[in-house]
A protein has these predicted regions:
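Walker A/P-loop
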Residues: 23
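The conserved Walker
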Residues: 17-18
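Conserved substrate/cofactor phosphate-moiety recognition/catalytic segment
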Residues: 30-80
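Small-molecule kinase domains that catalyze NTP-dependent phosphoryl transfer to phosphate-bearing small molecules
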Residues: 142, 146-192
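Conserved phosphate-donor/acceptor-positioning beta-strand/loop module used by diverse small-molecule
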Residues: 123-144
Length: 199
């Protein structure tokens, strides 16, 4: 309606390697942000959006529907999944809906693409925040094993190959990131997160 002022739409990324707790934090942050701002937020988790589709495709490509880390997956499905994830986010942002996007996005973070508005396809009216959730490698591996997700089977069976893709951004090289150490006490982590996000 005329005269109603709308806040700039927010695009918040929760990134980090598998097992670090990014999805759990994002799901906890969303209702807290809604309560704090009165605004609507859409949760876009790559695994939720593309998990079943990727299972069907990888079952045909490799015979393993749970494969999410092998070279065939990385070659054929990784980029289309992220492209679809970002298209969905842009569609919601254009409608004035804030988006919380959850996915590893490690290549994109390393290359600073999440601050490249041309790559994101968003204008200056969108507020972009990037949270990088991290844990020590051994703790992340323990969490992955404990959660029992079949999609982690290739990762766990080929850990030495998988771990070569792991990287930890530094505050100096990636000042755009909120680096969140999820090995800290849970309430302290969440308080740090919400303070940084303005919730």
């Amino acid at each position: 309606a005329p005269g109603i002022l709308r806040a700039m739409p927010r695009l918040i990324f929760f990134c980090g390697h598998a097992g670090t707790g990014k999805t759990t934090l994002a799901k906890r942050a969303l209702p807290a942000l809604h309560r704090a701002t009165g605004e609507s937020f859409c949760l876009l988790d790559k695994d939720t959006l593309y998990g079943d589709y990727s299972s069907a495709v990888m079952g045909v490509l490799t015979g393993d529907p749970n494969d999410r880390d092998s070279p065939p997956y990385l070659q054929h499905l990784r980029e289309p999944e992220y492209a679809g994830l970002m298209k969905t986010a842009r569609e919601n942002l254009a409608l004035g809906v804030n988006c919380i996007v959850v996915g590893p996005l490690s290549r994109e973070v390393r290359a600073h693409k999440l601050t490249d508005r041309a790559w994101l396809g968003v204008g200056d009216e969108v507020q972009v925040r990037i949270v990088w959730v991290h844990l020590p490698e051994d703790e992340a591996r323990q969490r992955i094993a404990a959660r029992g997700n079949p999609n982690d089977a290739w990762k766990l069976a080929h850990w030495d190959d998988y771990r070569t893709r792991l990287f930890m951004p530094s505050a100096q090289d990636h000042p755009e990131l909120l680096l969140l150490d999820n090995s800290e006490p849970a309430e302290r982590v969440f308080e740090t997160l919400m303070t940084a996000l303005g919730g």
